[in-house]
């Protein structure tokens, strides 16, 4: 349907658009990793008694049908059950349903069909008993209005057997800024998931980690867009390949004589809406069809602008789940604040709600930016900053510091030098090595471009000497350069005079341990000011001089 519409365009831009689409090889995983669902067809229908008893006929081919009334009204069917409270968890082929009646808790599947779980749940209750904004596979909350009952009744009979679904994401724990050494930091991906597939597991003792349940994951992509380090990224295809596809699409469009290209990122799930939008938009609007809108991040948006695009739009709907709208709006607002600093219209990157097309055309930006950088290399942040620096140079933007919103993953770290003991707790938890030691002397150093504002360093500092400030430093050299936040002369060992630790740390330890039974004597207190080798030598010399002293503690 979409291809047919695009082929009908006869304008020069329309022909260039079709040439670009036909001559750009889409990069996708041919054999992606998958997860499998096993469904025997045991179906649970939840809702008011009168309603659920009426809709069993279209599902007569299912292995079994169990009815669960939520209004307590009497019914006529023998497979009808009642409950005061209901708890549902799971996914296609593995729905656990626990009900409580008169204070007694029961596994409904065991009571109704002699198994542990149901395979499919058709939920006719008004608000739905599972809260995920994007329903898990096998769960049909038609009482909430989507999907429609007719569509659910048509699909449910097909859900018997074994089904494979792609693993949409890759997780690289080494890049994750969520937790380190018992300290919790970034939780952007957990907050961004509308399907309930991500969670933080662990404890302060064992450490926390991000877990992705592949059976719940629906491939929405908000987590990948929100992740500042690319620890979690979309895999069908991966972000770098998507970016290359957009860059080559634009190159082919220009090669065919097209002008002022506008990239319209569309979801493959809503082809009819995409067609409606393209019917009213000009022929220089090029659709880029992806699985989900949020799977394409801010780095790809700006990569399009530095490769000839005059604007990047998202073909969105106000019927999308609230979390998807929130994350997309949050990221686009961030991009628009950067565009404003560059002196570009904020609509250069914008969300086009398809419902608004009834009211008129959106603001279209068609001023060429004069950049064609080609493939951008590096990780997500490196690609983004390459694009931003190129735009800043071309547009003669002021190399100043721009304050950003509190949620921004860009910024600086400030250190109160009078409180810092250079213990390096912050360095130990920093996931990107934005904070790092000097190596040859006691010093804390910082690279602003690498800081993701995860807050781990601030929480880990025992002296509360650090603070984080979200901002973007448009001075490339200053942003990429190494800054010394705090530096001291090293303390020298009292015996061998070897530099071995920051003087402030030695002073702090002597102050805190003075009066402790193990450091009651001046000699014992002085050992804190010795290097590790001399400390041992001094202890054994004291023991040799007075062997009974060690028994007095």
Task: Show the residue positions of the predicted features.
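Mobile, glycine- and charge-enriched loop segments
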Residues: 260-294
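Long, compositionally biased charged/polar accessory segments in the mid-to-C-terminal portions
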Residues: 285, 291, 310, 316, ...
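Short Cys/His-rich "knuckle" micro-motifs
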Residues: 197-203, 225, 231-237, 438-439, ...
